[in-house]
Amino acid sequence: MSHASRRRWRRATTSAATAALLCGALLTFPSAPAAAQVRLGSGSYTTVLPPGASGPSDHTGAPVAPKVTADFTQPVVTNDWWSSLIFQRYPGNPYGENLYAHPLSFKAQAHGLEVGYPDTPELVADGLKYQYTHSPDFVLGIHGLNAPAAKVAGYSDWTVTADLSDGTRQLRTTIGQGLPFVYADVSGGPIRVEFTAPPTVWRRSGNAVGVTVNGHHYALFAPSGTTWSESDTVFTADVGGSGYASVALLPSPDDFDRYAPYAYSFVTSTTLTYDYDPASATLTSTYRVTTEAREGTAQGTLLALYPHQWKETTTALTDLSYASPRGPMRVVEGDRFTTELTTHGILPSLPTVDSADHQRLRALIDAELHASDPWKGASDTYWTGKALGRLAQLVPIADSIGYTAGRDALLDLLKNKMEDWLTADGPGDNAQFYYDDQWDTLIGFPASFGSNTELNDHDFHYGYFITAAATIARYDRSWISEERWGPMVTTVLRDANNPDRDDERFPWLRSFSPYAGHGWASGHAGFASGNNQESSSEAMHFAASAALLGSLIGDEELRDLGVYLHTTQASAMRRYWQNADGDAFPAGYSHDVVGMVWSDGGDHRIWWDGTPEELYGINYLPITAGSLYLGHDPEHAAAMHQSLVTRLGRQPQVWRDIHWAHQALSDPDAALAAFEAQWQSYEPESGSSKAHTYQWLSTLAEFGTVDTSVTADTPHYAVFRDGDRRTYVAFNPTGQPLTVTFSDGTTLTVPPGQLATG
């Protein structure tokens, strides 16, 4: 059974305990399309589900609709930390799974919202997984509430408002990542807090109570003029016909008075904005909260930051902190905080060095180009995507060695396949995209890995299509024009990560969780452990492809989206998948790397019964020039490679090319030597080719490792160092000559559409 088959099987069996685009302006997407096909330039998609195909479904295969309230008006979000509230994966569970917002965790139930603080890790599965499991300290509800289901009433960038109603009583709670508060609006009865153990009350201040339960400290705040009635494990506050309350998680009882001023400053919205400044090679991200004072005049709140945020923030930190599966969270005070990251460039390809054997490169390109099936039997969005990516990487190599006929033949292959997929030709079309206006998503058929039924992995799949489109655009700008294939390409891109908040066809950043700093793969998050992300590198591949495409078509919004995603995820990936700072994994966890990040922890396993090489490699592939982030710290890259070798007791034998490419980011000479000894006998990983691996290794053997101490005033550059010698590379996506200035004073003049090296 192939690794794909194993991956598909485990995903399928693991259970849980138009707006048409481009042409300069958006058109109104009809709520009930008059025709099955919606044309965008030369391309089209269908609004009718292909015969025999399935859209979003529950675990039994029955179609499901988003679980939202009657007053919900936003695009439907999937692939987030709270998605099990909106996507009912299991027919017997209308309330959703555990929700890990950090520092708090939650689970909706008929009588209210469970609230807990998972601050103690446990090791499970023979120590392969660490997890901070949700265990409720109390249920926040209304006296007599018996809601048949939980629904989503609204959301913002990292919060969600959950609705529990039974026709007489209604509880709406707003919860969010980094929020130590729970905000509740109630009607139909008294607010009710039922603890899971008798609490210790250490503070009574009329409408506010401080308690400790299960070793965790909370402050309960009801409206002024009300009091809390206490009866063993049940506390109630009569707020009349309707009212509000908040609950705060306190680091210690001594912090009661630091949280009380914000008890009635209810968070109503959260917003992430980012600004990329090429001149300074800086990405500035600002996280804002909007609050409403239910009493008093207080504004802002207290926010707990993940390590990738507080270690890069320019905002003053307090001395308050919490535990989380990502490491210690630090607290800021106010209505916003800002992070700053250095951008280290995204290249479309590496240069080919003169020392490489160009005749061998040509022969290896021909082996791919003239294979009996260059697509290797691919038919669905994932495997077709990987084949597109493999062939796309060969185009600039062929061009760099003067093999123009090979380059053009490869481009023809890419164009024909892309045009087939980007055109919906009716019921018999075996390669097309379908827009689901109920779920606000674009699904490619044939689908795979639950990209249709579970809305999994859209950025993983579609990133390959965007790479192919960017490669074509690099050599044929007319192909990507608004009159031809550009509108359909950018529609595919925007399904996965839409930067335009006014484009109601798709949610903003479906495949990226801005507070978490990375994406979530599962559309429904229907797991007791929350959501998960396995292949961080395929998410990074999408980001790189978006940045390159945006630059090539002159769309700064898409370019900056790609830069934001790539830079932010690189910061999170090294910390949460590879524990680069040493404080993400808990004490006693014996592994150097996890194959998957879960909402509740990390797992040294993957979705199929793979080898150690695959566990490490699924977070490296596909290897492209956008993968240089894996070598931003060559010592850390070397440690990761040695970690795998130590575990194996030998050099990698599976996906050897992926691991040679990764090894080359710290020891390119050794990686090239290994390739030279085995290049005629090894089997390439399905998304890789011998030509690309050889070119990658030979270039890095000459250039050295990535040098992040030097930046440039363009999104598309890299600097390498071999001893005292630096090599500078830049790409010019425009139609005019471009002078790139590096931070050490070096300049490169780059011809239109070309790479330059100095």
From Swiss-Prot:
Stretches for region (alpha/beta)6 barrel subdomain: 352-704
InterPro entries: Endo-beta-glucanase, GH81_C, GH81_N, TAT_signal
Effect of S535A: Increases enzyme activity on laminarin but not 1,3;1,4-mixed linkage glucan
Organism: Thermobifida fusca (strain YX)
Protein name: Glucan endo-1,3-beta-D-glucosidase
Binding site for (1,3-beta-D-glucosyl)n: Y382, K386, D457, H461, N532, E534, E538
Superkingdom, natural source: Bacteria
Protein family according to the UniProt entry: Belongs to the glycosyl hydrolase 81 family.
